Amino acid sequence: MAVNLSRNGPALQEAYVRVVTEKSPTDWALFTYEGNSNDIRVAGTGEGGLEELVEELNSGKVMYAFCRVKDPNSGLPKFVLINWTGEGVNDVRKGACANHVSTMANFLKGAHVTINARAEEDVEPECIMEKVAKASGANYSFHKESTSFQDVGPQAPVGSVYQKTNAISEIKRVGKDNFWAKAEKEEENRRLEEKRRAEEERQRLEEERRERELQEAARREQRYQEQHRSAGAPSPSSRTGEPEQEAVSRTRQEWESAGQQAPHPREIFKQKERAMSTTSVTSSQPGKLRSPFLQKQLTQPETSYGREPTAPVSRPAAGVCEEPAPSTLSSAQTEEEPTYEVPPEQDTLYEEPPLVQQQGAGSEHIDNYMQSQGFSGQGLCARALYDYQAADDTEISFDPENLITGIEVIDEGWWRGYGPDGHFGMFPANYVELIE
């Protein structure tokens, strides 16, 4: 609702005119509302300036003050309009009276400075006069005679800003700068040295770990050969172990001579295994294979030497060369009968593949190693000596002291079993020890 200035219009106009009249002793007027209505009335006038006006402000009301002050720069009269909203006024009243500010500014026109105040700190006389001085725009004064030229006698010589250079202080300043520069350089060198030592230590530990793995593999091979020599049996490792060790050593020397880091022994083993699988497939006779079912049967013994789990192939006894192979083939056919059905008349079209005999040597080598160690290859448990992280999903990860169950010995250097998380996969044999 709009503010009402007509009800007490003559009194309001008289108070305003008395303030703006320069020769009038009245220098301030205070206006407020009549109760909770929007009618404006004169709350009071005075001649005491800002100090007296501030004392009349009520913290529980909305009031409008109009005051005449003297500009400290020019000495001319200036008018100040104060929109006072006390801290005790409720929010509804504050919102309603906020729309009346522009109407009151139009009525009390001619104000040079307008101040919106809520607390006593906002209406301190010093603060108001400072705002009036800033609003004048220039520091000048009227009605003041300028001082005429006066002969004050001879003036003193103009002082110089030159300062004599102090060699000692200059040396100290330069020395201080050099000291901090040297300290920063030493700190940088120290950090670089620590980084270099850490890198050397890491490389040394990595080299020791690789050497330890190679030594453990060599000791395991040597122990395997000694056990076979003590038992009087021919050592298969004399035919397979030494070429494998020589291949690993030769690959390691090639990498070191090329200036590169030697690969992990497991990677060398994988490369050797892939090469053996390729050679075995090439040496077979694909011209005699006319059935996909028989081709699958012939490739199953090939994968038994690798990492995939397959049924164990029976080994021929001493002095027997050709008899056990058909029994192995027939047993494989018996296991596959629910899925594949081979006509009887096709049996005469296939000959006994030499691939089974070629892979028999590898299986015999693994079985001899298993028998020499005193375990059957399945249902074993082992405790982890070192931590190992799986390189892919066919391997398992474990930490020291973890138990690995259901171990299957598929190779001298790689076994399979269930890890701590229940995942079944391969792991290096020299990272664990069997539990009796």
UniProtKB/Swiss-Prot annotation:
Phosphoserine: residues carrying this PTM: S160, S277, S280, S283, S291
Sequence similarity: Belongs to the ABP1 family.
Location (main, coarse): cytoplasm
Gene: Dbnl
Role description: Adapter protein that binds F-actin and DNM1, and thereby plays a role in receptor-mediated endocytosis. Plays a role in the reorganization of the actin cytoskeleton, formation of cell projections, such as neurites, in neuron morphogenesis and synapse formation via its interaction with WASL and COBL. Does not bind G-actin and promote actin polymerization by itself. Required for the formation of organized podosome rosettes. May act as a common effector of antigen receptor-signaling pathways in leukocytes.
Modified residues (Phosphotyrosine): Y340, Y350
Subunit structure: Interacts with SHANK3, SYN1 and PRAM1. Interacts with SHANK2. Interacts with FGD1, DNM1 and MAP4K1. Interacts with ANKRD54. Interacts with COBL. Interacts with WASL and WIPF1.
Localization: Cytoplasm, Cytoskeleton; Cell projection, Lamellipodium; Cell projection, Ruffle; Cytoplasm, Cell cortex
InterPro entries linked to this entry: ADF-H, ADF-H/Gelsolin-like_dom_sf, Drebrin-like_SH3, SH3-like_dom_sf, SH3_domain
Start and end residues of each SH3 domain: 377-436
Post-translational modification N6-acetyllysine, affected residues: K176, K296
Tissue specificity annotation: Detected in hippocampus neurons and in the Purkinje cell layer in cerebellum (at protein level). Predominantly expressed in brain, thymus and spleen. Also found in testis, heart and lung. Little or no expression detected in ovary or muscle.
Lineage: Eukaryota, Metazoa, Chordata, Craniata, Vertebrata
Statement: the UniProt record of this protein carries the keyword Cell membrane: yes
GO biological process: adaptive immune response; endocytosis; neuron projection morphogenesis; podosome assembly; Rac protein signal transduction; synapse assembly
Domain ADF-H: 2-133
Protein name: Drebrin-like protein
